[in-house]
Amino acid sequence: LVGKVPYFWGGKSAPGWNDEWNTPRLVTAAGSSTTGTIRPYGLDCSGFSTWVFNTAVGVDIGAGTSGQYPNSVAVSASELLPGDLGFLAESDGSGWNHVLIFAGYGENGERMWVHSSGGQGVILNSPSYEASLSLRRPKNVDFNAPVPGDTLGTPISTLEVDVTHYCACAKCCG
């Protein structure tokens, strides 16, 4: 979905490709400067993480950052695995502002995250605020279990491959 799905405040979707992505829709969710405007439909940050886990492994990790955070447990940076989540706190500490999915390490050893970012849509990067993230692992996902699936004839055998596949694959994502 990287580069294919725009950010849309309040954007959620059922598993699989959604033909409504990129079509003009009214933003009805409260709490954003875009509320009441027409924008290309897509996913917000928590809608994206929910979509990835529902599509990739058939697991519901919770709705919204406020639902996903308590459905996860803290992990250290040394324990971080692809598929773990990073939460960015609200500036006043009242809750969680953003959620990202850890995708692995970049060429220079930097941690890479896939997420739906306001103004950019679904992206893969190492954001400037990365050191401020609360690192978490979804409680109801078995990170050691093989993941069923197929990508170009090769079985998908790890959550790392599956998360990468469903986040960036053009074959099954439009």
What function would you assign to each model-found segment?
Residues L1-S46, T50-V59, V114, P148-G174:
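N-terminal capping segments
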Residues T50, N54-Y129:
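...with weaker cross-activation on analogous glycine-rich loops/strands in unrelated enzymes
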Residues G3-V5, T65, G83, N125, ...:
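A general marker of short, structured functional hotspots
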